[in-house]
Amino acid sequence: MKAELTAIIEAAEDGGYWAICPEIPGANGQGDTIAEAKASLKSAIQLIVEDRLEDIRRGLPEEAIEETILIP
């Protein structure tokens, strides 16, 4: 899945950086550098999305149709 999401990155008081994604509640990351914080955030987003998809699919009947849609 490809998506463009917002990463908000701030310096942490104790050093390093933390990052959040406002479009994905609960998605956050941290690291010693901005690059590490972004990588940590990307991993968190992937895990959250995969987990939510698994939860949704568990309740669907077998005959449900799953398609990909593009949003410009």
Swiss-Prot record:
UniProt xrefs under SUPFAM superfamilies: TTHA1013/TTHA0281-like
UniProt-listed InterPro entries: TA_system_antitoxin, TTHA1013/TTHA0281-like
GO biological process, one term: regulation of DNA-templated transcription
PANTHER family with a match to the protein in the record: ANTITOXIN HICB (PTHR34504:SF4)
Record-stated family: Belongs to the UPF0150 family.
Name of this protein: UPF0150 protein ssl0738
